[in-house]
Regions:
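Short, small-residue-biased leader/transition segments that mark boundaries at the very start
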Residues: 2-7
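Acidic-glycine-rich active-site phosphate/pyrophosphate-binding loop
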Residues: 8-20, 56-63, 112-114, 166-176
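Flexible, glycine-rich active-site loops centered on histidine and acidic residues
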Residues: 46-79
């Protein structure tokens, strides 16, 4: 992995592959495991600023390239993946909210590698756990407050699929119904920015998502970053 990979614009390649016109902006957003949520916020802002009705947001990671196989406390947790969602800007009263945050002072900066992109990922798992179980419930409360909804109004809560214990801890802290919290990390591991859209796709294919359901997605990632959103689900029509 060299500078060619670092500066390669994935979004532009997708735009070309889909044969989209030149007046459809395409850009990459990097916010680690929070990337899908950050990308959704950027997409919503672009729709509001430039006009348009639909935005395609893709979360994708190939973390196996950045793992140190000797670091068994980290490398066994992650997987490669990609997922996508189409967002529609509507004139209806369907509730929507999104919140983001960052704490740059909490990052651990390793020594610089001799080649760009060659430093493996390292993580203080216990510190991340403490951060996550505090940030995720706050994100959920924020989007619920903004939409004047309650946990009971939600059909699903889709967390970043980092760790089952983190999700369980959030369920307990929120006094929530664990059945509303989807999990798939036992099959895919932590796929970083891909984890939320991959989970949503699995749920849609399994018939778990129904039109009109209110769904909250919450996540956290390196940086440190975090975010949450509340959307109304609508099946993607083909035609």
């Amino acid at each position: 992995r060299g500078l060619g990979d670092v500066y390669k614009r994935q979004a532009c390649q997708v735009q070309a592959a889909l044969a989209l016109p030149e007046n459809r902006p395409a850009l990459d957003v990097n916010a680690a495991c929070s990337g899908f949520l950050y990308g959704t916020a950027v997409a919503r802002g672009l729709l509001a600023t430039l006009g348009g009705q639909y935005a395609l947001v893709i979360g994708t990671e190939a973390l196996s390239r950045l793992m140190d196989p000797a670091d068994r406390s980290t490398c066994v947790l992650f997987g490669d993946g990609a997922g996508a969602a189409v967002f529609e800007l509507t004139d209806t009263s369907a509730p929507f909210a999104i919140t983001l945050g960052a704490r740059g002072d909490a990052a651990i900066h390793a020594g610089g590698p001799s080649r760009a992109g060659s430093a493996p990922i390292s993580m203080d798992g216990r510190a991340v756990f403490r951060f996550a179980v505090d940030a995720l419930p706050k994100c959920l409360h924020t989007v619920l407050d903004e939409t004047r909804l309650t946990l009971e109004d939600l059909s699903w809560v889709v967390c970043h699929q980092a760790n089952s214990r983190i999700i369980d801890h959030c369920v307990k802290a929120l006094h929530a119904d664990a059945a509303k919290f989807y999990k798939n990390m036992d099959r895919h591991g932590n796929t970083s920015a891909a984890s939320i859209p991959v989970a949503l796709n699995e749920m849609a294919e399994a018939g778990l998502l129904k039109a009109g359901q209110k769904v909250s997605c919450i996540g956290f990632g390196g940086g440190l970053t975090w975010g949450g959103m509340l959307v109304t689900y609508s099946p993607l029509s083909h035609g």
